[in-house]
Amino acid sequence: MAFKKKLYQFRPKDQPQKIERHVTKDRKRTVSVNSISLERDVRQMLAEKISGTHVGLWLLIGEHLRLRTWDLLTSWTGSGHNNTIEPRLALQMVHESALCVTGVRERRTLRQKGFETLNGLPFVATDVAIHQLLDHHTIAEAEALQVALGQIRSARGHYQGQYVLIDPHRIMTWSKRQMPPKKASSSSPIRKNMQTFFAIDGESGQPLSFGIGSSSVRVSQATLSLIDRLAYILPHKALILADSEHFTVEIFNRLLNNRQFTILMPTPRRKKILQQAQSLTFTPKWAGYAVAEDSYQLTGQENSYRLIVQRTGETKDNYNYKSFATTSNKDKADLMTLIFPQRWDIEEFFKDESALGWNRASTFNLNIRYGRLSMALIAQAVIYQLRKKLSENINRWTAESMAQKFFKGIDGDLRVKNDKIIVTLYNAPSVEILKEHYENLPRKLEAEGVDPRVPWLYDFKVDFRFK
């Protein structure tokens, strides 16, 4: 029978992987895992029951199933079946973003509170394991993930507006790489920044996609790449509201005859444009406000663009001119007074949601940053769906408040009953509203046409009790 020895080594698709995990707050250990050991250890943890303060995160499971998060993550990781570890590590990143955790993982205490089990893991992976996963996936794969997520969100009605807000958002970075320091604003100190470009739906305030600038990627390149992804995500026409730094030949030439997108942006305060604005004949709209229109041609270009100008002030001595360039044919006064001011709503998005992962960057490795920020997009999407089911005084909380008071601030326990994981939450806020949406969750999901089995929890269903 010697010929039968070590046949397990030839078992297909189940080779063990080395993963670094947290053992305690200060100790780490590299362990060998495969799909069988993962399932065995997770089932053992559930059989022993779990108590902790992270059970509020389990309310996101229903939203994950509705948003098809698992399909997105398995596609991004290239996993062929549901028992692999890579999409579970990606799910850990999504839930870390939801908790707004920052700093080095050695300083965190996420273990044994229901967090790792939620990810379908018997442990919390370390920075090394997470960075190895992210570094193996390219920028193109992260962009494809953004498009797939955006298409799902569009189908679910998350994007309703006629306007898309595009804004450069600078993230502080503590990377040791040599890079030119910049100012995030005229009043801020000079420091290393990572420049990102976000596209936000103008009506719902929800993010569509993002790009990252680097030394080799100019503003025009990053913006046009972002607009290309928007064309796959949005099924309808939209007006893009941009900043003056997007005033480039490449962007205008691309959008001049675009059938889906038009653009509106303030022009830079150049002497040539100011002289042209001052020479126009203005039409008064109300006291101290007048508008005018002309065409403008960039130097060396054959194409001309619509130049609209607003003039404020009552007398010639205190006139102030502000000009905009656009490819839209909407009324000029409406564009400048009603539509463009909506662009500043994007600042509200960064103020409320940046703690999910858009406020600091520890590395400038682009594979890692694109992957990490894309996981934060998924976290923001499922939290948005959860917010719509909460009371008004809670759904207006910032991402950080949601993490502290809701996801980490509710005591509870987990136990298994037949094919269900029963999650009990004690002293949850707005309990009657939560009962309405989450008690008997499997039945509610089936009524919506959603499979209630959770693939990363080995097809267990999840139900909730509130006490």
Model-derived features: positions:
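Conserved nucleotidyltransferase catalytic core and NTase-mimicking acidic/glycine-rich helix/loop elements
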Residues: 382-415
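Short acidic (Asp/Glu) and glycine-rich catalytic loops that position anionic groups and cofactors
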Residues: 38, 72, 111-113, 205, ...
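Domain-level cores of phosphate- or acyl-group-handling catalytic modules
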Residues: 217-272
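An anionic, glycine-rich sequence signature occurring as long contiguous blocks
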Residues: 3, 259-354, 440-467
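Short, conserved catalytic/metal-binding motifs centered on acidic residues
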Residues: 93, 107, 126, 130, ...
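Dynamic "connector" segments at or just before major functional cores
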Residues: 2-188, 198-216, 223-228, 232, ...
